């Protein structure tokens, strides 16, 4: 599932000035890639990425000013296709009247920004990548624990929401409960958020639906968070081997990314919120270069080696 973006959305997000063709603001934008139509101004249209936002900077405008008006109008008309979303001019540069005429005829919006071309390009690309990123929904709870986005998964009734409530009481922040919308902003980033209709809400069996922001304040929630680790809760299986040292690192795949995963068995008497809290701290410590399990194994091997040499 992908979210649609219109030229109007881009205009409002970046506070762009509309030069012409207001009725074309509902044109869809289908890609985050931008085009700098320098070669097109010379007449090269063998490859013209017509579905991209066309960005004009100082180079393109300066080059076009050296062209004859008739040729300039011809080139701009060639750029105006049914799939072209919009033309964007940077640096508050003067918009060529031929571009305005061609855009009006094709009902393509012409927008202008005061930003420099490179910075404007970055802002547009980042915004479109965020909005056009592929999205999936996962059953689980997303909590911000010590700055880490922890996605808690598990079968229905295993205690995910109750654990999240305890984590909120311990000072952490709820992002989403029950249904987590996950979008892949780039090859290394997964962002989780809540559907608008259930944002800030927790469903607790026997208690019902509670509003976390109303009960605990604005500091207890956040709208989105990068997913760093997955904690999977499952009912204790006496026949299953669970990691007791921490040397093995499980992974789970979301989109095409491998996310670190910790499986926590659930049974009466285990304080899941504390376990997950410590798991987040331990994961952060590993990223800082210290692994308690590896250090223990190394110390144990050194001790065994020392005792063996003493016995020889």
Swiss-Prot record:
<keyword id="KW-0511">Multifunctional enzyme</keyword>
<feature type="active site">
    <location>
        <position position="244"/>
    </location>
</feature>
<feature type="binding site">
    <location>
        <position position="161"/>
    </location>
    <ligand>
        <name>Mg(2+)</name>
    </ligand>
</feature>
<keyword id="KW-0119">Carbohydrate metabolism</keyword>
<feature type="region of interest" description="Important for the catalytic mechanism of dephosphorylation">
    <location>
        <begin position="265"/>
        <end position="270"/>
    </location>
</feature>
<dbReference type="GO" id="GO:0000155">
    <property type="term" value="F:phosphorelay sensor kinase activity"/>
</dbReference>
<keyword id="KW-0479">Metal-binding</keyword>
<feature type="active site" description="Proton acceptor; for phosphorylation activity. Proton donor; for dephosphorylation activity">
    <location>
        <position position="178"/>
    </location>
</feature>
<dbReference type="InterPro" id="IPR003755">
    <property type="entry name" value="HPr(Ser)_kin/Pase"/>
</dbReference>
<keyword id="KW-0547">Nucleotide-binding</keyword>
<comment type="function">
    <text>Catalyzes the ATP- as well as the pyrophosphate-dependent phosphorylation of a specific serine residue in HPr, a phosphocarrier protein of the phosphoenolpyruvate-dependent sugar phosphotransferase system (PTS). HprK/P also catalyzes the pyrophosphate-producing, inorganic phosphate-dependent dephosphorylation (phosphorolysis) of seryl-phosphorylated HPr (P-Ser-HPr).</text>
</comment>
<comment type="subunit">
    <text>Homohexamer.</text>
</comment>
<dbReference type="GO" id="GO:0005829">
    <property type="term" value="C:cytosol"/>
</dbReference>
<dbReference type="InterPro" id="IPR011104">
    <property type="entry name" value="Hpr_kin/Pase_C"/>
</dbReference>
<protein>
    <recommendedName>
        <fullName>HPr kinase/phosphorylase</fullName>
        <ecNumber>2.7.11.-</ecNumber>
        <ecNumber>2.7.4.-</ecNumber>
    </recommendedName>
</protein>
<feature type="active site">
    <location>
        <position position="139"/>
    </location>
</feature>
<dbReference type="GO" id="GO:0004674">
    <property type="term" value="F:protein serine/threonine kinase activity"/>
</dbReference>
<keyword id="KW-0067">ATP-binding</keyword>
<dbReference type="InterPro" id="IPR011126">
    <property type="entry name" value="Hpr_kin/Pase_Hpr_N"/>
</dbReference>
<dbReference type="GO" id="GO:0004712">
    <property type="term" value="F:protein serine/threonine/tyrosine kinase activity"/>
</dbReference>
<dbReference type="Pfam" id="PF02603">
    <property type="entry name" value="Hpr_kinase_N"/>
</dbReference>
<dbReference type="Pfam" id="PF07475">
    <property type="entry name" value="Hpr_kinase_C"/>
</dbReference>
<feature type="binding site">
    <location>
        <position position="203"/>
    </location>
    <ligand>
        <name>Mg(2+)</name>
    </ligand>
</feature>
<feature type="region of interest" description="Important for the catalytic mechanism of both phosphorylation and dephosphorylation">
    <location>
        <begin position="202"/>
        <end position="211"/>
    </location>
</feature>
<keyword id="KW-0723">Serine/threonine-protein kinase</keyword>
<dbReference type="GO" id="GO:0000287">
    <property type="term" value="F:magnesium ion binding"/>
</dbReference>
<dbReference type="InterPro" id="IPR028979">
    <property type="entry name" value="Ser_kin/Pase_Hpr-like_N_sf"/>
</dbReference>
<feature type="active site">
    <location>
        <position position="160"/>
    </location>
</feature>
<comment type="similarity">
    <text>Belongs to the HPrK/P family.</text>
</comment>
<keyword id="KW-0808">Transferase</keyword>
<feature type="binding site">
    <location>
        <begin position="154"/>
        <end position="161"/>
    </location>
    <ligand>
        <name>ATP</name>
    </ligand>
</feature>
<keyword id="KW-0460">Magnesium</keyword>
<dbReference type="GO" id="GO:0005524">
    <property type="term" value="F:ATP binding"/>
</dbReference>
<dbReference type="GO" id="GO:0006109">
    <property type="term" value="P:regulation of carbohydrate metabolic process"/>
</dbReference>
<keyword id="KW-0418">Kinase</keyword>
<dbReference type="InterPro" id="IPR027417">
    <property type="entry name" value="P-loop_NTPase"/>
</dbReference>
């Amino acid at each position: 599932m992908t979210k649609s973006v219109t030229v109007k959305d881009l205009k409002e997000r970046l506070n762009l000035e509309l030069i012409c063709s207001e009725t074309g603001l509902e044109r869809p934008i289908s890609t985050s890639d931008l085009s700098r139509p320098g070669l097109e101004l010379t007449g090269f249209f063998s490859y013209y990425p017509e579905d991209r936002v066309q960005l004009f900077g100082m180079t393109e405008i300066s080059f076009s000013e050296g062209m004859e008006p008739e040729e300039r109008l011809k080139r701009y008309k060639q750029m105006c296709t049914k799939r072209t979303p919009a033309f964007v001019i940077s640096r508050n540069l003067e918009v060529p009247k031929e571009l305005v005429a061609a855009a009006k005829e094709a009902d393509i919006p012409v927008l202008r920004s005061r930003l420099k071309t490179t910075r404007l390009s970055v802002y547009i690309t980042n915004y479109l990548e965020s909005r056009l990123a592929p999205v999936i929904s996962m059953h689980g709870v997303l909590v911000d624990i010590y700055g880490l986005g922890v996605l808690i998964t598990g079968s229905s009734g295993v205690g995910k929401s109750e654990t999240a409530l305890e984590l909120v009481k311990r000072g952490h922040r709820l992002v989403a409960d029950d249904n987590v919308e996950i979008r892949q902003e780039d090859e290394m980033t997964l962002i989780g958020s809540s559907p608008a209709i259930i944002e800030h809400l927790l469903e607790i069996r026997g208690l019902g639906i509670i509003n976390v922001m109303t009960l605990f304040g604005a500091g207890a929630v956040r709208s989105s968070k990068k997913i760093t680790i997955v904690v999977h809760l499952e009912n204790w299986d006496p026949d299953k081997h669970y990691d007791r040292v921490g040397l093995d690192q499980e992974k789970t795949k979301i989109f095409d990314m491998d996310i670190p995963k910790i499986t926590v068995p659930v049974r009466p008497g285990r304080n899941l919120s504390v376990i997950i809290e410590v798991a987040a701290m331990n994961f952060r410590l590993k990223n800082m270069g210290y692994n308690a399990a590896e250090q223990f194994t190394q110390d144990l091997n050194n001790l065994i080696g020392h005792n063996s040499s003493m016995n020889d």
